[in-house]
Regions:
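Compositionally biased, low-structure terminal segments
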Residues: 5-7, 81
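C-terminal structural segments of small proteins and small subunits
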Residues: 51-85
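Intrinsic-disorder/low-complexity, polar/charged segments enriched in Ser/Thr/Lys/Arg/Asp/Glu/Gln
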Residues: 1-5, 60-62
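Compact, glycine-rich, soluble single-domain proteins
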Residues: 7-48, 52-53, 57, 65
Length: 85
């Protein structure tokens, strides 16, 4: 299991466009990816669950990666977050 945190920089937080791209990306990876904010969490493959986290600009999210090639999945997700959020 790998974990890391990311501070959201996008002015709109996690909204439809980047959430949709994240879901599409997560479905191509062989790891289970979960995003958490506070005591709420959501699978990175579920669009509405991600949007319901209510992540805004400046919020810190925790990303947990389990199974498959965790190191590769972490690199891919970290790169996506930096580029899109």
């Amino acid at each position: 299991m790998r974990k890391f945190e990311y501070t959201v920089r996008d002015a709109l937080g996690i909204h439809a466009r980047p959430a949709g791209l994240l879901v599409k990306l997560a479905k191509t990876l062989d790891s289970e990816i979960t995003l958490s904010k506070g005591d709420r969490s959501a699978s990175a493959t579920r669009l509405m669950a991600l949007m319901n986290l209510g992540v805004g600009q400046g919020d810190v999210i925790a990303i947990t990666i389990q199974g498959g090639n965790e190191a590769r999945s972490e690199q891919v997700i970290a790169s996506f977050l930096t580029e899109h959020l």
